[in-house]
Regions:
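Active-site-proximal beta-strand elements of phosphoester/diester hydrolases
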Residues: 85-95, 200-210, 263-267, 329
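Acidic/histidine-rich helix-loop elements
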Residues: 61, 88-104, 124-133, 160-171, ...
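Short, Asp-centered acidic motifs that coordinate Mg2+ and/or phosphate
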Residues: 117, 151, 185, 201, ...
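Binuclear metal-dependent hydrolase catalytic cores centered on His/Asp/Glu-rich metal-binding motifs
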Residues: 162, 182-184, 197-262, 272
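N-terminal membrane-anchoring alpha-helices
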Residues: 2-82
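Catalytic metal-binding/acid-base residues of hydrolase active sites
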Residues: 95, 125, 157-158, 192-193, ...
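Conserved beta-sheet core of the metallophosphoesterase superfamily
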Residues: 269-329
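Membrane-embedded segments
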Residues: 86-186
C-alpha cells in the first residue's frame, strides 16, 4: 500500500518536539512517557510564602488607604452650655501621603461631618519633605467648610518650622509653613482664644503654659537687637516673630481664668509624670483635653459636652503594622 511520505507511521511520531520536551523515555516495562521530576518541596513552600507575603503587603496597602472618622464626645465638668457641642476635627501624621486624587478619600469621609475648627498635630509633611498633600488637604477643608480656622503644630519628623538655614530662599520660615499659611492654615505659636457668648475656650500647646516669660523676654529682646545691628532682614523677621508670639502668649495668660476651657495640642504625647506633676491652680493643671499625634491611630471628630456621662472608645482596623498601644484619654 502506498503511503504519503508525510504520513506518520506511528501514533507517537505525531508529537512535536515542543510536546516531547517535557517528557523522557521510560525504562522497559514502564509507560512510554512519564513527567519530569517536580520541584523540591522546600522550593514550593518558599514560593508559596513569598506569594503570601506579597498578598499581605498588598492588602495592608489597600487598608491603609481607607479613611474612617471616629466620633468622640469629650465630657468637661462645669463647662458652660454656650460651648456645648463645639467640635474639633483632629488630623495628624499625614506624612506627605495622598489618599486618592486631591485627597478624595478624605473628602468623602468628611463630607457629612460638621466641625467648628481643625487641628493638625504634626508630621503632616514628615521627612519626605512633600508638602503638596498637606496643601491639598487644607484647600479641600476650606472647600468643605469655607472659613473654618485651621491650626497646626510641627511634629518631630517635620522640617523645623523656622530657622536661619532657610534664609537663602528669602525667608526664615520653612517652605511648608509658608505654603500652608498662604492657603489659610495658622501655625499655633501662641494661645488662641475662641469665644462663645462671653465664655472662652483656649487652644494652646502645653509648652506655652509653662514658659519662663521674663527670661525668654530678655533673651528674645537681645536677639532682636543683635539682628538689627547686623542688618539681616531674615534675622530681623525671625526675632521679631519670636517677640510677637511671646507677647501674645503673655497677654493670653493674663486673660485666662479658671472658668475657661483649655485644650492643648502636642505631637508626642506628654509623659504621665508631666501631667501628674501639674499642680492645682497652675496653667498646665487647668488642661481639660490634650490632643496628640505621633502614634498614627484614628482621626477624630471631638465634640465637647458638659453632660456626657460615659466615654466610648471607637476602634477600627488600620492595617497589619499599627501602633503597639492605643491611646485613650
Amino acid at each position: 500500500m502506498n503511503r504519503r511520505p508525510s504520513q506518520s507511521r506511528s501514533g507517537f511520531d505525531s508529537f512535536s518536539p515542543q510536546h516531547t520536551a517535557h517528557f523522557k523515555a521510560a525504562q522497559p516495562g514502564d509507560e512510554f512517557f512519564e513527567p519530569r521530576p517536580r520541584a523540591p518541596l522546600g522550593r514550593r513552600v518558599l514560593v508559596f510564602l513569598l506569594l503570601l507575603l506579597l498578598a499581605a503587603l498588598a492588602a495592608n496597602l489597600a487598608i491603609n488607604q481607607f479613611v474612617q472618622v471616629a466620633r468622640v464626645t469629650v465630657p468637661i465638668r462645669k463647662m458652660d452650655s454656650a460651648l456645648e457641642g463645639y467640635t474639633l476635627l483632629h488630623i495628624s501624621d499625614l506624612k506627605g501621603a495622598s489618599y486618592g486624587a486631591n485627597q478624595s478619600r478624605i473628602r468623602f469621609a468628611l463630607q457629612k461631618e460638621d466641625f467648628d475648627a481643625v487641628v493638625l498635630t504634626g508630621d503632616m509633611v514628615s521627612s519626605r519633605g512633600n508638602a503638596q498633600p498637606l496643601y491639598t488637604l487644607i484647600e479641600m477643608l476650606h472647600e468643605l467648610k469655607p472659613g473654618v480656622p485651621i491650626y497646626m503644630i510641627p511634629g518631630d519628623k517635620d522640617p523645623l518650622p523656622a530657622s536661619m538655614s532657610y534664609a537663602a530662599s528669602g525667608s526664615p520660615f520653612a517652605p511648608w509653613v509658608l505654603g500652608a499659611r498662604r492657603r489659610g492654615a495658622q501655625l499655633l505659636s501662641a494661645p488662641v482664644r475662641i469665644e462663645r457668648d462671653g465664655h472662652a475656650l483656649w487652644l494652646t500647646t502645653s509648652a506655652l503654659l509653662s514658659l519662663d516669660m521674663d527670661t525668654m523676654q530678655e533673651q528674645f529682646e537681645r536677639q532682636y537687637l543683635d539682628a538689627l545691628s547686623g542688618d539681616d532682614e531674615n534675622a530681623i523677621e525671625l526675632t521679631a516673630y519670636n517677640l510677637q508670639w511671646l507677647t501674645e502668649t503673655r497677654d493670653a495668660r493674663a486673660q485666662m481664668t479658671d472658668e475657661d476651657v483649655y485644650i492643648a495640642l502636642t505631637h508626642v504625647p506628654p509623659a504621665d509624670e508631666e501631667l501628674e506633676g501639674a499642680y492645682a491652680g497652675s496653667l498646665r493643671g487647668r488642661l481639660h483635653l490634650v490632643l496628640c499625634g505621633h502614634y498614627q491611630g484614628d482621626w477624630f471628630v471631638c465634640r465637647l459636652s458638659a453632660r456626657c456621662l460615659f466615654r466610648r472608645r471607637i476602634s477600627r482596623f488600620t492595617g497589619f503594622f499599627r501602633a503597639k498601644t492605643p491611646i485613650t484619654g
